[in-house]
Amino acid sequence: MFSDAIRAVILGIVEGVTEFLPVSSTGHLLLAERFFDLGSGNFWNTFTVLIQLGAILAIVVIYFEKLWRIALGMFSNDADRRFVIGVLAAFLPAVVVGLIAGKYIKELLFNPWVVCFSLIVGGAVLMWVDQLDHKPHEHDATAFPLPMYIWIGIAQCLAMIPGVSRSGATIVSAMLLGADKRAAAEFSFFLAIPTMIGAFAYDFYKNRADMTTDHLGIVAIGFVVSFVTAIVVVKAFLSYVTRNGFTFFAWWRVIVGTLGLIALALGR
């Protein structure tokens, strides 16, 4: 239906748009592959992991000054050191659960039905949290208390279920724990860096035999498209949610999940 280059562009756009929005990039990629013949098989499964690095690079570029300052100061500045420890503490639960249960989660839950139900349920939760009488007391993503970082990391484990959304789980948990909307979103971005690099390294090592030099051009296309798209989306997303909240994204999830269920019921 599509050439490999067009598939790479479309999947790169889907990844760049959805990775940092609370709508589940994995869920959208699985549905795109299912309904639009955008590639399946070991190479394309690995491809969707590889292009996440483009989205991660976008976060590094956007927050480079802050991340560089923290990297330089983590051995001499208590606040920077606490933040690095907090990110690592939030990252650790996903490592443990992924190593123990990741294989079984992929075998049992990586299907379009689970994605659609997760999108709908997650949308309802996001809408509920967004409409709470929220009185935030944490306004700096780099200065949350350590227990808060740990709880956010535990919540992130729910995102191993396709359709839940890593950013959605971390943003919702951060807001319930007292973060304002912008701080919740920003910490979700920061936590994505080690989480997604770890997922990439693990999946790439397992599936390295499926990659050849013939694939480099296709991967490069997806990587660049994902990077450029993510830069635009992240900047717009922060501005939007600070003013308007997350209701739009909650409805997005519900609508996509419902349309997906209808398509599946009709035999697509």
UniProtKB/Swiss-Prot annotation:
EC number(s) from the headed UniProt entry: 3.6.1.27
Catalysis: reaction(s): di-trans,octa-cis-undecaprenyl diphosphate + H2O = di-trans,octa-cis-undecaprenyl phosphate + phosphate + H(+)
Membrane topology term: Multi-pass membrane protein
Pfam families found in the cross-reference section: BacA (PF02673)
Subcellular compartments: Cell inner membrane
GO CC terms of this entry: plasma membrane
Molecular function (Gene Ontology), one example: undecaprenyl-diphosphatase activity
Biological process per Gene Ontology, one example term: response to antibiotic
Database matches in InterPro entries: UppP
EC top class named in words: hydrolase
Keywords, comma-separated and alphabetical: Antibiotic resistance, Cell inner membrane, Cell membrane, Cell shape, Cell wall biogenesis/degradation, Hydrolase, Membrane, Peptidoglycan synthesis, Transmembrane, Transmembrane helix
Location (main, coarse): membrane
Stretches that traverse the bilayer: 43-63, 83-103, 109-129, 144-164, 184-204, 218-238, 246-266
Family as reported in the entry's similarity comment: Belongs to the UppP family.
Entry function: Catalyzes the dephosphorylation of undecaprenyl diphosphate (UPP). Confers resistance to bacitracin.
Note, other: Bacitracin is thought to be involved in the inhibition of peptidoglycan synthesis by sequestering undecaprenyl diphosphate, thereby reducing the pool of lipid carrier available.
Protein name, UniProt field: Undecaprenyl-diphosphatase
Species annotation: Nitrobacter hamburgensis (strain DSM 10229 / NCIMB 13809 / X14)
